[in-house]
């Protein structure tokens, strides 16, 4: 590729609405341009990287036995009504009517369509296992699109769907996809972790997320540095921090805590550790035609509620936070001084695992400006229902028993689910088993955010000059920067020869023949993030040398002119083989 025949749309300044590094650099490097909120044009530089991501994803999906197809972006509402997600999905699902007043959606995902294909095409157990995948544009009407391609409304995604006759087959399909994802993200040159996760709106029983590790990541990941344990903080099991409950050592006592509505303030006033205070959270579940059920969830003062865990408890799937009016009605006091002792009306109490093992703790007195100290289970309160309802913290014991938890930030770029029969039962996707009886197909779902990978890769690989692409997804692997290409026959002939040698070696090279000043050339290609650069100048050529600098190198080095192409080609091949 010659730069004079290519579009390079670099900018010196980032747009005012760009909040994170990847958004700023993708705009400045001429990769994307905004069309509307969360919707982007992908310019030639950006599209080259997208195509490289797609190629790696496609190769590994094919290697794992995936079969590519293409489903429509527009889907009829009837399919979503069959699955039940027409009502469940919410405003993120973009709905519209055609001229005949039929309801349609722009697909954010394709479980319904692929299940429709399967129920019409797969009739026998002999046709399974099968795994269909596509690489296609999706749309989710995010309430607040931001961060460029990281949280856009329109995006490119690879989604795959497996169909099996039994649980053993589903487990094998899941393992193949998990292994394929490990290969994909390894080949992309990214530091990543696979973490146990919640299945979210997709549904299902078992899932893992693949996260690119980055300080700017939206998701908190709990992991153990001394073992293989890793989980999204929403899904990580929180073990009790107290192995055995101590015997009571204090009498229960009502204490004045004027104006101290927070656990931290109460602990400071009473000169006790925060870990001895209790955070009381009031939830409600609605009952048709009757008053709501009120739940008091008790956490240690330094812990945070995990709503996803709560929603999986019996009776709490559709919980909400209680209103202040409800809190006053059941507890006789506004929030800030709530507790399980002496409630105005009966409530259901759930204690976190750690709280259940505490002694001599402090709770709200259900009276403004008062708390109760020295509270103990069994003596002052009945034994509670116990559940894991909190987020893990750094320093907690690892659930696998092999160390302690640490927390890092990650950007989700892939997700694998075991859906089971969620969609096949809802939509009647059955097959005839070995005995001729109809059975629901067992499904798996496997997604990779193609365009999101670009943003995540940049968040992990950049400096003050611009992007630092891994070789596998760089728009170009090497750039040739000739000094005076249009003025020096020696420079032009050498640059053209190097270009031909690199092309012949299968290297993705661009020759900058625009006639720009060296500073402009270097700034453009450092901003765009090309991993390798060769500078061809008359002075060096007279000594038989060409200047080489890797994008991560602090200094340039000199290479023999006749070996420069082979040397750089070998560096690129070695990087791609890692």
UniProtKB/Swiss-Prot annotation:
GO terms for molecular function: aminoacyl-tRNA deacylase activity; ATP binding; proline-tRNA ligase activity. One of its GO terms (cellular component) is cytosol. Its EC number is 6.1.1.15. It is found in: Cytoplasm. GO terms for biological process: prolyl-tRNA aminoacylation. It catalyses: tRNA(Pro) + L-proline + ATP = L-prolyl-tRNA(Pro) + AMP + diphosphate. It comes from the Bacteria. Keywords: Aminoacyl-tRNA synthetase, ATP-binding, Cytoplasm, Ligase, Nucleotide-binding, Protein biosynthesis. Pfam families: HGTP_anticodon (PF03129), tRNA-synt_2b (PF00587), tRNA_edit (PF04073). NCBIfam families: PRK09194.1, proS_fam_II. Homodimer. Belongs to the class-II aminoacyl-tRNA synthetase family. ProS type 1 subfamily. Consists of three domains: the N-terminal catalytic domain, the editing domain and the C-terminal anticodon-binding domain. Catalyzes the attachment of proline to tRNA(Pro) in a two-step reaction: proline is first activated by ATP to form Pro-AMP and then transferred to the acceptor end of tRNA(Pro). As ProRS can inadvertently accommodate and process non-cognate amino acids such as alanine and cysteine, to avoid such errors it has two additional distinct editing activities against alanine. One activity is designated as 'pretransfer' editing and involves the tRNA(Pro)-independent hydrolysis of activated Ala-AMP. This is Proline--tRNA ligase. It comes from Burkholderia lata (strain ATCC 17760 / DSM 23089 / LMG 22485 / NCIMB 9086 / R18194 / 383).
């Amino acid at each position: 590729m010659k730069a004079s025949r290519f579009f390079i749309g670099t900018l010196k300044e980032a747009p005012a609405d760009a909040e994170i590094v990847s958004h700023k650099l993708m705009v400045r490097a001429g990769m994307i341009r905004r069309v509307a909120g969360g919707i982007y044009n992908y310019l030639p530089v950006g599209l080259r990287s997208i195509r490289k991501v797609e190629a790696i994803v496609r190769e590994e999906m094919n290697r794992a036995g995936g079969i590519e197809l293409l489903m429509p972006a527009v889907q009829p509402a009837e399919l979503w009504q069959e699955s039940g997600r027409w009502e469940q999905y919410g405003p993120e699902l973009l709905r519209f009517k055609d001229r005949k007043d039929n309801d349609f959606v722009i697909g954010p995902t394709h479980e319904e369509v692929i299940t429709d294909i399967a129920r019409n095409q797969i009739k026998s157990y002999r046709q399974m296992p099968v795994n269909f995948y596509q690489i296609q544009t999706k749309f989710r009407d995010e309430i607040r699109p931001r961060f460029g391609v990281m949280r856009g409304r329109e995006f490119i995604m690879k989604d795959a769907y497996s169909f099996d006759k039994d649980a053993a087959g589903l487990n094998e399909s899941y393992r193949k996809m998990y292994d394929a994802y490990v290969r994909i993200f390894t080949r992309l040159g990214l530091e990543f972790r696979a973490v146990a996760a919640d299945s979210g709106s997709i549904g299902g029983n078992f899932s893992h997320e693949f996260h690119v590790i980055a300080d700017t990541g939206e998701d908190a990941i709990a992991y153990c540095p001394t073992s293989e344990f890793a989980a999204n903080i929403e899904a990580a099991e929180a073990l009790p921090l107290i192995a055995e409950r101590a015997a009571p050592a204090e009498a229960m006592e009502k204490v004045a805590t004027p104006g101290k509505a927070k656990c931290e303030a109460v602990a400071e006033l009473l000169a006790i550790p925060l870990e001895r205070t209790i955070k009381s959270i009031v939830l409600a579940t609605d009952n048709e035609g009757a008053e709501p059920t009120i739940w008091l969830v008790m956490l240690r003062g330094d812990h945070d509620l995990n709503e996803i865990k709560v929603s999986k408890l019996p009776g709490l799937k559709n919980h909400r936070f209680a209103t202040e009016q409800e809190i006053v009605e059941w507890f006789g006091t506004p929030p800030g001084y709530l507790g399980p002792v002496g409630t105005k009306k009966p409530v259901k109490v759930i204690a976190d695992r750690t709280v259940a093992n505490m002694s001599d703790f402090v709770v709200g007195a259900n009276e403004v400006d008062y708390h109760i100290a020295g509270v103990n289970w069994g003596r002052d309160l009945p034994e509670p229902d116990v559940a894991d309802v909190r987020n893990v913290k750094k320093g907690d014991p690892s659930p696998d028993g092999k160390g302690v938890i640490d927390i890092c930030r990650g950007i989700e770029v892939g997700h694998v689910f075991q859906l089971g029969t969620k969609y096949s039962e809802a939509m009647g996707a059955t097959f005839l088993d070995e005995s001729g009886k109809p059975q629901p197909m067992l499904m798996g779902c496997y997604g990779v955010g193609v365009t999101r990978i670009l943003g995540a890769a940049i968040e992990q690989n950049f400096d003050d000059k611009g992007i630092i692409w891994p070789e596998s997804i760089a728009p170009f692997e090497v750039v040739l920067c000739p000094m005076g290409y249009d003025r020096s026959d020696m420079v032009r002939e050498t640059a053209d020869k190097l270009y031909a040698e690199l092309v012949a070696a299968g290297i993705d090279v661009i020759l900058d023949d625009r006639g720009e000043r060296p500073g402009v050339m270097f700034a453009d290609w450092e901003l765009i993030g090309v991993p390798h650069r060769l500078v061809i100048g008359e002075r060096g050529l007279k000594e038989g040398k060409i200047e080489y600098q890797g994008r991560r190198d602090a200094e340039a080095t000199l290479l023999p002119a006749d070996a420069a192409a082979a040397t750089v080609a070998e560096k690129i091949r070695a990087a791609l083989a890692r």
